[in-house]
Design a protein with these regions (language model features):
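Sec-dependent N-terminal signal peptides of Gram-positive bacterial secreted proteins and lipoproteins
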Residues: 1-25
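Extracytoplasmic cell-surface/polysaccharide-interacting catalytic and binding patches
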Residues: 18-255
Length: 255
């Protein structure tokens, strides 16, 4: 009997260790150094910023999953998805927050449409290929076409859209006037409303202006990422990217 108990105990310990290692591996991201972090408050030291981090925040929060060129998406399973009335798909956790955002925006006279949500790895690869072919048709060389595409289209396994937590939002007025996914969208009132209010509903402007060296992507005023209200509030208030926020959390957790 004692021997059986010992075996069960060893098995339990082994399972716990494996689970712990799995979590550690999952959050072993390639992140910017603390010296690279650029906060909107120039007088705020990194140590002070770390002290201010939300008490409940932890880098293994699934809503903080980092996917970029340096951290490809290793998940093989499709995320839990939901469909909106236009047929766009995104993570089920976005349904209520996005509805709340749309409702609040409408009260202020702004209306939006999701133009892109969840994309599978295969869809992302197709989008990249279409972009390259489009630039080739415009007369660019293969190398230049791929270079320009890489500025806006992540490698197939390195797109946030594969998590279902990222959406591309554009104002309906902008779309009705023929507007597309362009940086100039940021000059419109609807884009400014999103940039200044999305955090209230748990979303962050993912690819900020002048943060290209951190995110690896050009400014995209339409691309928003759901991280939850607590994280989004801190990120917005301090002018951070997700990469920078995770770097701060990693430092805090290592102490």
């Amino acid at each position: 009997m004692q021997k059986k108990k010992l075996i069960y105990l060893l098995l339990a310990c082994s399972m716990f260790l494996q689970a712990s290692l799995a979590v550690q591996a999952k959050i072993n991201y390639k992140l910017p150094s603390l010296e690279e972090i650029q906060t909107s408050n120039k007088d705020m030291k990194v140590d002070a910023l770390i002290e201010k981090l939300p008490v409940t925040a932890h880098s293994n929060d699934p809503l903080l999953k980092l996917v970029n060129k340096n951290n490809p998406n290793s998940d093989k399973e499709e995320p839990e998805l939901a469909w909106d009335s236009y047929g766009y798909i995104y993570h089920k956790d976005l349904v209520k927050p996005l509805e709340d955002l749309m409702e609040a925006a409408a009260k202020d006279g702004f209306y939006y449409r999701v133009v892109s949500g969840y994309r599978s790895v295969e869809e992302q690869e197709n989008n990249r290929n279409l972009s390259i072919q489009n630039y080739l048709a415009q007369g660019l060389s293969q190398a230049d076409a791929e270079s320009v595409t890489n500025q806006y289209f992540a490698p197939a396994d390195a797109s946030e859209h594969t998590t279902g937590l990222a959406i591309d939002l554009l104002g309906t007025e902008w779309l009705d006037n023929g507007g597309e996914l362009e940086a100039s969208y940021s000059e419109t009132d609807s884009a400014k409303w999103l940039a200044n209010n999305a955090h209230r509903f748990g979303f962050i402007l993912r690819y900020q202006q002048n943060k290209e060296s951190i995110t690896g992507y050009n400014f995209e005023p339409w691309h928003f990422r759901y991280v939850g209200k607590v994280h989004a509030g801190f990120i917005y208030e301090n002018g951070l990217t997700l990469e920078e926020y995770l770097a701060l959390l990693a430092k805090k957790e290592s102490n």
